[in-house]
Structure formats: structure tokens, C-alpha cells
From Swiss-Prot:
Record-annotated membrane-spanning stretches: none
InterPro entries cross-referenced by the UniProt entry: Annexin, Annexin_repeat, Annexin_repeat_CS, Annexin_sf
Domain of life: Eukaryota
Protein name in UniProt: Annexin B10
Gene: AnxB10
Annexin repeat windows: 15-86, 87-158, 171-243, 247-319
Gene Ontology molecular-function annotations: calcium ion binding; calcium-dependent phospholipid binding; phosphatidylserine binding
Length: 321
């Protein structure tokens, strides 16, 4: 089944960057800020259009739009709006960098960003990360992770995965399924290196075939095998790859659910997914969320510990309930 991503944010038409720039300036000028105007303009435009508005704003007012937004806004609402103003790949690089900065590493964020990307998407992230932070992503990651988890992420980041233009090969899928079976359920202990190699090298369409063949061969799903054979971060990373191969929308729907159903709300994850998927497949994620959890994502965000302009910005990005 081919994945059909549907976004919630698209190009606005008609589009007048100069008028938008003036509306934004008026919303931030003088005493107080008109947050609703900011939401209406920036959520209602695509990222490319926001970059045009930013350029026009600077040309017309000799001011930096993002700096003005940072001065006027605060807290989680600012995080959403500033996130929307960043080119998508830069935004993900910033999130990766933040996940590895300071004490401890947010492995779940690394998994969410790195294990869900095609090789083509990964190449862009690697290039922008190094340009922005003057350090290769693989090197930074190696210093923050360890063991087979580090090995898997390193393989993914170094771009060994076959591109989407590589034809799927049923014969090879049978062979890869047999290798996974021999490396896991068919033996005492687990040969993680075999799992790492196949999970990081094969394209997503090829892996879909491998997982089907695995079920035929072993009578078990690949998820069951991973649950038995892996633990901790490696388990999470493998499961993320499997979920994204089968349905990226289901993977992100589950991540959003967990972000809102723990002790308190994981705002960073909530913001990152809603902002970064809004122009890719957020509409599809909404449909999957409702299918899996029997409630709308819109209502879940409204009921989560979100409030004020922050809540309004998130629900605006989600589009119609």
C-alpha cells in the first residue's frame, strides 16, 4: 500500500507578501501584540511563503522579522512561531542539536528524526547540520550515543540506505528476511549487527517486502521479533523504522499520543511534530490518530496541558477539527 501524505498547511492563494509584512509589523508595533494576527498570517502560509515575507519585511522595515517575533512573543507560543519561520531542514537540525546539547541525550528525539527519513531526506539534514554547527552530525552523534544504537544511527546518518529509485527485489527480500530470522529468533542471543545492516541499508519499500517475507518465514511479525530480541534505545529505533516503513502517520500519531499522555505534556515533541509535519502529512496523521485512539487529535491537543496563544497556534496548524 503506497503512503499518501496529506498536509494541513499549503501555499496561500492569493498571496501578497508585502501586505502580510505590513500586517505583522502592525501586530507588533506600539504597546501590546496582536497574537491572533501573527497566527493567522504565519500559520496560513507555507514555509516558502514565510521566507518571502521575511525577506520583504526586512526590505520594507529594515528589521529582522524573526528577531521582532522573539522580542514580542514568549514561551511555547514563541517556540511554535519561530519554528514555523525556519526552513524545514534547518528546523530539524536545530532539534537534533538541542537533543544532544547539555547533560544527557534525548535518544527518543534522535530516533524520531533520524529513523524516519529516506536517504534523500537524510542527505539534506547531514549537509545543513554540518554547515550550521561546523561539526559533522555523525561525529556529534558518536560522542553522545553508544553500542549498537550508535552503530545503527551512524549507518543511517552516513547515508548507506538505498534510494527510493532503487527497484524492490523480492528474491533479495526473502534472503534478507531469512538473515534476520537466523540472526534473532532462530538462535540463542541476537546478532544485532545483521539487524542494523538490513534496517539501515534497505529502502523503505524494500523493507516493507522484507517484513512481509519475515512473517511468511517465521509465522511472527517483525515487531514481535524485535520485542523479543532488542531492548532500550535499539529497540525503540528498530520499532520506529518498522512503524515508518508501514505507516509514517501511525508512528507520529503514537508519538503525539505519548507526548500528551504521560506525567505532564511533552511540549517539545508536540511542537516539533506538529510544526515539522504540517506541510508533509499532518492531515494523514490526524486521520490515523482518530483511527487508533478513537478521538480527534484536535480534541486531544485542546485537552492537553496547552493554553492561550500556544494552544491557538497548534490548533490552527491542525486545521479543521
Amino acid at each position: 500500500m503506497e503512503y499518501k501524505p496529506v498536509p494541513t498547511v499549503k501555499d496561500a492563494a492569493p498571496f501578497d507578501a508585502s501586505q502580510d509584512a505590513q500586517v505583522l509589523r502592525a501586530a507588533m508595533k506600539g504597546f501590546g501584540t496582536d497574537e491572533q494576527e501573527i497566527i493567522d498570517v504565519l500559520v496560513g502560509r507555507s514555509n516558502q511563503q514565510r521566507q518571502t515575507i521575511k525577506a520583504v519585511y526586512e526590505a520594507e522595515f529594515e528589521r529582522d522579522l524573526v528577531d521582532d517575533l522573539k522580542d514580542e512573543l514568549g514561551g511555547k507560543f514563541e517556540d511554535v512561531i519561530v519554528g514555523l519561520m525556519m526552513p524545514p531542514v534547518e528546523y530539524l537540525c536545530k532539534q537534533l542539536h538541542a537533543a544532544m546539547a547539555g547533560i544527557g541525550t534525548e535518544e527518543a528525539t534522535l530516533v524520531e528524526i533520524l529513523c524516519t527519513k529516506t536517504n534523500e531526506e537524510m542527505a539534506q539534514i547531514v549537509a545543513v547540520y554540518e554547515e550550521r554547527y561546523q561539526r559533522p552530525l555523525a561525529e556529534q552523534m558518536c560522542s553522545e550515543t553508544s553500542g549498537f544504537f550508535r552503530r545503527l544511527l551512524t549507518l543511517i546518518v552516513t547515508g548507506v540506505r538505498d534510494g527510493l529509485d532503487t527497484p524492490v527485489d523480492v528474491g533479495q527480500a526473502k534472503e534478507q528476511a531469512a538473515q534476520l530470522y537466523s540472526a534473532g529468533e532462530a538462535k540463542l542471543g541476537t546478532d544485532e549487527e545483521v539487524f542494523n545492516r538490513i534496517m539501515s541499508h534497505a529502502s523503505f519499500p524494500q523493507l516493507r517486502l522484507v517484513f512481509e517475507e519475515y512473517k511468511v518465514l517465521s509465522g511472527q511479525t517483525i515487531e514481535q521479533a524485535i520485542k523479543h530480541e532488542m531492548s532500550d534505545e535499539l529497540h525503540e529505533a528498530m520499532m520506529a523504522i518498522v512503524e515508518c516503513v508501514q505507516s509514517p502517520a501511525a508512528f507520529f500519531a503514537n508519538r503525539l499520543y505519548k507526548a500528551m499522555n504521560g506525567a505532564g505534556t511533552d511540549d517539545a515533541t508536540l511542537i516539533r511534530i506538529i510544526v515539522s509535519r504540517s506541510e508533509i502529512d499532518l492531515e494523514t496523521i490526524k486521520q490515523e490518530f482518530e483511527r487508533i485512539y478513537n478521538r480527534t487529535l484536535h480534541s486531544a491537543v485542546v485537552d492537553a496541558e496547552t493554553s492561550g496563544d500556544y494552544k491557538r497556534a497548534l490548533t490552527a496548524l491542525l486545521g479543521s477539527a
